[in-house]
A protein has these predicted regions:
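N-terminal metal-binding scaffold of metallo-dependent hydrolase/deaminase domains
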Residues: 1-57
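Conserved beta-strand scaffold positions in the cores of enzyme catalytic domains, especially
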Residues: 4, 61-65, 178, 405
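Divalent metal-coordination and catalytic microenvironments
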Residues: 8, 38, 43, 68, ...
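C-terminal cap of metal-dependent C-N hydrolases
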Residues: 19-27, 358, 378-412
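Metal-associated gating/positioning segment near the N- to mid-region
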Residues: 63-129
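Metal-coordinating catalytic core of metallo-dependent amide/deamination hydrolases
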Residues: 114-129, 135, 143-256
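Active-site-adjacent C-terminal substructures of enzyme catalytic domains
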Residues: 245, 255-372, 384-388, 397, ...
Length: 412
């Protein structure tokens, strides 16, 4: 089917194809044309232009009137924990009362709280709850999403989570990437026996995940009070044996070796980075691993923001993601994430847009097909209400601006 989108005030995030990520100064370029049209065939972008340069084609099956709105590529959210068993607002109050993330975890809250609740829920209940959140983020402009396990912390429950993620991928129009995060914390029954738990992850969980083809990637929480660089290396090596490349939660709580171990294993991304050092930034220059910042986490936990401005100035690419989860970021609103990146990390709007689209896609190994408006890419985009400029999107940080959303050329 041929779909024409016309009457576009600004068509933003365009490229001619072949752009897989943007680094350093390139991130300040978020190309756009005005008074434009775009043609989609069978869910794939085929061409676009300005009406002044070339009239829109007429031999189409359907026309969508953008009504003077801006068309943007859908957000690519490369770090979420959207499958979970319930909210944790009691811990929200604990944080207000001064308890730290680590103190809440030691009291049996945090990740272990979510694991206990998930154990009691059926796969169907988990799926139904997660799909509500998936529909929510689609409506807010997200078109590709990474979803992690990590609230199971035993083999059966980790597999249950990953089967839910697979079902979301099979039944939802959003593009889903699945990541196994059995090493999110030490399961409660392994308290005081972290080495035995790592053995379980390596010898039982990863082979079981691979046998069912349930995950694209393997992630580890490599940070102070969680898993050591040595344990992380062992888990990532086990994943690679089954074709699952690594991703890392690192440098969130302290400079604890996460960046170094990510680079050692050529991890696809290293995420959080609130405690990233100048030495870490220097180590990452010229490497393939995508630094990924999670500004919503810093906002919600009232902790320092990752030094993204330094990273970009050093020539690095940067992605930003929501970290949607019940404990530290109960929101998947990528528009707000973009606003936070501008306000708190001092990114220019264009830099934040690139971090949330093409670089987010790269952090999921999806940028060949997603993350920009380009011929040959999947037609994932949203149409805004008429706005004065694309800078209005992060400026009006709570204003609903999305009018219509499309995934693979189909309106949602």
């Amino acid at each position: 089917m041929k779909l024409l989108v016309n009457n576009i005030a600004t068509l933003a995030g365009i490229d001619g194809g072949g752009v897989l990520k943007k680094c350093g100064k390139e991130m300040a370029q978020f190309d756009a044309i005005n008074d434009a049209w775009m043609l989609v065939e069978d869910g794939i972008i085929t061409e676009f232009d300005t009406t002044a340069n070339r009239p829109a084609p007429t031999n189409v099956d359907k026309t969508v009137d953008a009504a003077g709105g801006t068309v943007m590529p859908s957000w690519c959210d490369s770090h979420t924990h959207i499958v979970y068993a319930g909210s944790r607002e009691r811990e929200f109050v604990d944080k207000i009362n001064g308890l730290s993330y680590a103190e809440i975890a030691k009291r049996g809250g945090g990740i272990l709280n979510s694991a206990d609740r998930l154990h009691e829920m059926s796969e169907q209940q988990l799926f139904d709850a997660a799909m509500e959140r998936v529909h929510e983020v689609i409506a807010k402009g997200t078109g590709a999403i990474e979803i992690k396990s990590g609230y199971g912390l035993n083999t059966a429950d980790e597999l249950k989570m990953l089967r839910v993620i697979r079902r979301i991928s099979e039944t939802s129009p959003i593009k889903v990437v699945s990541t196994f995060l059995g090493a999110h914390a030490v399961g409660r029954e392994y308290a005081g026996r972290q080495g035995d738990y790592v053995d379980l992850v390596v010898n039982e969980m990863i082979p079981a995940v691979a046998a069912e083809g349930l995950a694209n990637f393997v992630d580890v929480f490599c940070d102070e009070g969680f898993f050591t660089p040595e344990e992380t290396s062992r888990i990532l090596e086990a994943g690679l044996k089954y074709g699952m490349r690594g991703k890392i939660h690192g440098q969130e709580l302290a400079p604890s070796g996460g960046v170094e171990v990510a680079l050692k294993h050529n991890a696809l991304s290293v995420d959080h980075l609130e405690s990233m050092t100048d030495e870490d930034i220097a180590m990452m220059c010229g490497r393939d691993t995508m630094p990924t910042a999670l500004p919503g986490t810093s906002f919600f936990l009232n902790m320092p923001f990752a030094p993204v401005r330094k990273m970009i100035n050093a020539g690095l690419p940067v992605a930003i993601a929501s970290d949607y989860n019940p404990g530290s970021t109960p929101s998947g609103d990528m528009k707000f994430v973009v606003s936070l990146a501008c306000i708190k990390m001092r990114l220019q709007p264009a830099e934040a847009f690139n971090a949330a689209t093409i670089n987010g896609a790269a952090a999921m190994s999806l940028s060949t097909d997603y993350g920009s408006i380009a011929p040959g890419k999947v037609a994932n985009f949203f149409i805004t209400k008429p706005i004065s400029s694309i800078d209005f999107i992060p400026y009006a940080y709570t204003t609903p601006i999305i009018n219509r959303t499309f995934l693979a050329g189909m309106e949602q």
